[in-house]
Design a protein with these regions (language model features):
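Short, polar loop/linker segments at the starts of domains and inter-domain junctions
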Residues: 44-51, 149-158
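A short acidic, often aromatic-flanked loop/helix-cap motif at beta-alpha or helix-coil junctions
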Residues: 41-42, 147-150, 163
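Beta-strand-rich binding/interaction modules
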Residues: 124-146
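Loop/helix patches that line or flank the sugar-binding groove of alpha-linked glycan CAZymes
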Residues: 1-115, 120-127
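C-terminal beta-strand-rich structural cap/linker in extracellular carbohydrate-active enzymes
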Residues: 151-171
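A residue-level detector for conformationally permissive "hinge/kink" positions
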Residues: 4, 8, 92, 137, ...
Length: 171
């Protein structure tokens, strides 16, 4: 969702719904009824065999009420796409930080530049001096994910499983 273009979300993905095609030549197990959480009782498609007991991530209703849920995370990412038009419309250039676990993009759009960085490590924080990179952005606009980020002078620290958006000013 933090890339250019028009993202596609398959329904249920935003709440972590599970399903599998298996060996059957049908999509019935991937087109299960949406788990809204209200009193409605939608039925799964005919011929579906995926056990409802494996749907362990909750419903739309329960995830909307839960801070930090997958659905709230998706809502935040969509909000960021709307707040920063450069994300869906900009020109992307890869940023090489010399790390297999941290990287990202410079995004240019209508004279402004954002930098979107991701630390995909599960346990190792990432630190870089932005003065040693081609990243012109020096202000943290957004922190997304599991941890924190900080910018002390030009030294950026990014926690594991965390992304951020850098810019020169708020949109």
């Amino acid at each position: 969702l933090l890339c250019s273009g028009s993202p596609f979300l398959y329904y249920g993905e935003e709440i972590g719904m599970k399903g599998v095609r298996g060996s059957a030549n049908t999509d019935a197990n991937r087109r299960l009824a949406m788990l809204w959480g209200d009193d409605s009782s939608p039925r799964d498609p005919e011929d579906s065999t995926y056990p409802s007991s494996k749907q362990t991530n909750g419903t739309v209703e329960s995830q909307l009420a839960q801070e930090g849920s997958l659905l709230r995370y998706y809502c935040r990412l969509i909000s960021l796409r709307n707040r920063y038009p450069a994300i869906p419309r900009g020109t992307y250039t890869q940023v090489n930080l010399g790390s297999a676990k941290c990287g990202g993009f410079l995004v240019e759009y209508e004279g402004s530049t954002l930098c979107i960085l991701h630390n995909i490590s599960t346990d190792i924080p990432f630190t870089v001096d932005l003065a040693d990179t081609d990243i012109p952005c020096r202000s943290i606009l957004e922190v997304i994910g599991m941890g924190e980020a900080s910018l002390e002078g030009t030294v950026l620290s990014l926690a594991p499983q965390t992304s951020l958006i850098l810019g020169s000013a708020a949109p």
